[in-house]
From Swiss-Prot:
Nucleus keyword on record: yes
Coiled coil: none
Function of the molecule: TFIID is a multimeric protein complex that plays a central role in mediating promoter responses to various activators and repressors.
Name used for this protein in its record: Transcription initiation factor TFIID subunit 12
SUPFAM superfamilies: Histone-fold
Gene Ontology cellular-component annotations: nucleus; SAGA complex; transcription factor TFIID complex
Compositional bias annotation for Low complexity: 48-58, 72-86
Top-level taxon of origin: Eukaryota
GO-annotated molecular function: DNA binding; protein heterodimerization activity; TBP-class protein binding
Biased segments, Gly residues type: 59-71
Main subcellular localisation: nucleus
Locations listed in the record: Nucleus
Amino acid sequence: MSDLFTTFDSNGVAEHHLHHNHNSTSSASGLLHDPPMASPSQHSPMTNNSNSSSQNGGPVSGLGTGTGPISGGSKSSNHTSSAAGSENTPMLTKPRLTELVREVDTTTQLDEDVEELLLQIIDDFVEDTVKSTSAFAKHRKSNKIEVRDVQLHFERKYNMWIPGFGTDELRPYKRAAVTEAHKQRLALIRKTIKKY
């Protein structure tokens, strides 16, 4: 069984690692090391990758990109080519975006500028989500990003609640505030009812 977990460097940047549980982990050096997983935030232009030369590259997984491995190799591998490759690979491709638009409306055509803008918004959304959820996991002093971290980010920043990922706590029902105008209308209705 394998676990995907996240560790954080001194700058708060998330590093994803994949570990396998083995009954016997022996090799020529005595330990079996699995390559860590890459995340989109590791190679973003906004982060400081001071420790990227000591990380292994690996396939990007769980993001729905359909991309293959970024790089694989030893601990001394150079990541300049893999960093440039992952920055140029969008989270959503233009053909997939066109396919999604056609699912909504078959007659709609997007301009080139609109496609570029939507792809940039998607990339920014995913990068922001990964960065914030990593910070929430770090605040919990955890090495794993959990569903509740993503839920917290979506609920606080976008006021979104994703159905199907319920928590143990019950959310209180928020009643709408009764305005003064509404109270006056109700009083008028009651007064009219009493007349008849």
